Amino acid sequence: MSEEVTYATLTFQDSAGARNNRDGNNLRKRGHPAPSPIWRHAALGLVTLCLMLLIGLVTLGMMFLQISNDINSDSEKLSQLQKTIQQQQDNLSQQLGNSNNLSMEEEFLKSQISSVLKRQEQMAIKLCQELIIHTSDHRCNPCPKMWQWYQNSCYYFTTNEEKTWANSRKDCIDKNSTLVKIDSLEEKDFLMSQPLLMFSFFWLGLSWDSSGRSWFWEDGSVPSPSLFSTKELDQINGSKGCAYFQKGNIYISRCSAEIFWICEKTAAPVKTEDLD
C-alpha cells in the first residue's frame, strides 16, 4: 500500500514539476516576445545606410585630399611660371634699356656727324666765295657764268632787253629757273645792294592771281607781310598786276609793261675737291 502511495506521489510531483516548467516557459514567452521581422529589416537598412554614408565620407575625404594635392601642385607650377614670366620681363626690359641706350648713342653720333658736315660745308662755301672774289684759277663754280651766287641761290640779272612779265617768266623757265622769289629780309637786302636795281626796273616772281583773288609767288606760296615795308604793303594791297623792284622798293605795275627781270635757281653744292 505504501509503495502505491509513493508512486502516486512521485508521479504527482513529476507532473507538477513539468507543469511548473511549462508555466515558467509560458511566462518567459509572454514577458519577452520575439522580435518582429519589420523592425529587423528597418535595423538592417539603417546599418546599411550608415555603412554607405561612411563609405561616402571616406570617398569624399579621399577626393578632397586628391584635389587639395592637385591644387597645391598647380599653385606651385603657377608660382614657378609667374617667376619665369617676371624674369623674362626683366630681361626684356634690360634689353630695351640697352636698345634705348644704343639708339641714344646713335642719335648723338648722327648729330655730331651732321654738325661736323655742316661746319665743313660752311667752311667750303666761305673758301669758295673767297676764291671767286680773288682769283679765277679755281674750279669752284656753284653757279653758271654770268650768274651771281648768294647763299643757296644763283641770280641772273637781265639787262640787255626788256620783256613783259609773262615773257620774262618764260625766259627764266628756259634757263631752268624762275622769276626771283624773296624768302627772307637778308635776301631782300642782297637784291637791294645790287647797283643795277638802283637805276632800272626788274620783274619779280610775284603776281596777282585773279582766279584766287590773292598775291602768289611763282611756287604758289603767299608772300609774308613781314618781308615788306608799309609802303610796299600799301602798293600790294591797293593794286592788281605784277610786282617789280626799283631803287630798293617793291612796286606794282601792269603785267604787260616791258622791263628787265631777275631769274633765280638753286646753287649747286660746293665740293671740297673743287677747292684745290
Curated annotation (Swiss-Prot):
User: Changing residue 7 to F: what effect?
Assistant: Abolishes tyrosine phosphorylation and inhibitory receptor activity. Abolishes interaction with PTPN6 and PTPN11. Abolishes protection against natural killer cell-mediated cytotoxicity
Q: Which domain of life is it from?
A: Eukaryota
Query: What is the induction comment?
Result: Up-regulated upon differentiation of monocytes to macrophages.
Domain C-type lectin, residue spans: 150-264
Q: Which residues lie on this side of the membrane: Cytoplasmic?
A: 1-43
Q: What residue intervals hold the motif ITIM motif?
A: 5-10
What is the recorded membrane topology of this protein? Answer: Single-pass type II membrane protein
What UniProt keywords are attached to this protein's entry?
A: Cell membrane, Disulfide bond, Glycoprotein, Lectin, Membrane, Phosphoprotein, Receptor, Signal-anchor, Transmembrane, Transmembrane helix
Write out the transmembrane intervals.
44-64
Summary of the tissues where the protein is detected: Detected in colon, heart, kidney, liver, lung, mammary gland, ovary, spleen and testis. Expressed in melanocytes (at protein level).
- Which residues does this entry mark as bearing Phosphotyrosine? 7
InterPro entries annotated for this entry? C-type_lectin-like (IPR001304), C-type_lectin-like/link_sf (IPR016186), CLEC12A/B (IPR042916), CTDL_fold (IPR016187), Ly49_N (IPR013600), NKR-like_CTLD (IPR033992)
A GO molecular function assigned to this protein is:
protein phosphatase binding
Q: Which CDD domains match?
A: CLECT_NK_receptors_like
Q: GO cellular-component terms in the record?
A: external side of plasma membrane; protein-containing complex
Supply one GO BP term.
Answer: negative regulation of signaling receptor activity
According to the record, glycans are attached at: 91, 176, 237
Q: How is it modified after translation?
A: N-glycosylated.
- The record lists its disulfide bonds as 172-263, 242-255
Q: Which residues lie on this side of the membrane: Extracellular?
A: 65-276
Where does the record place it?
Cell membrane
UniProt-listed PANTHER family: C-TYPE LECTIN DOMAIN FAMILY 12 MEMBER B
Q: How does it assemble?
A: Homodimer. Interacts (via ITIM motif) with PTPN6. Interacts (via ITIM motif) with PTPN11; this interaction triggers dephosphorylation and activation of PTPN11.
Question: What is the recorded function of this protein according to its Swiss-Prot or TrEMBL entry?
Answer: Inhibitory receptor postulated to negatively regulate immune and non-immune functions. Upon phosphorylation, recruits SH2 domain-containing PTPN6 and PTPN11 phosphatases to its ITIM motif and antagonizes activation signals. Although it inhibits KLRK1/NKG2D-mediated signaling, it does not bind known ligands of KLRK1/NKG2D and therefore is not its inhibitory counterpart. May limit activation of myeloid cell subsets in response to infection or tissue inflammation. May protect target cells against natural killer cell-mediated lysis.
Please state what the annotation says regarding this protein's domains.
Contains 1 copy of a cytoplasmic motif that is referred to as the immunoreceptor tyrosine-based inhibitor motif (ITIM). This motif is involved in modulation of cellular responses. The phosphorylated ITIM motif can bind the SH2 domain of several SH2-containing phosphatases.
Q: What is this protein called?
A: C-type lectin domain family 12 member B
Organism of derivation: Homo sapiens (Human)
User: Where is the organism placed in the taxonomic lineage, from the top?
Assistant: Eukaryota, Metazoa, Chordata, Craniata, Vertebrata
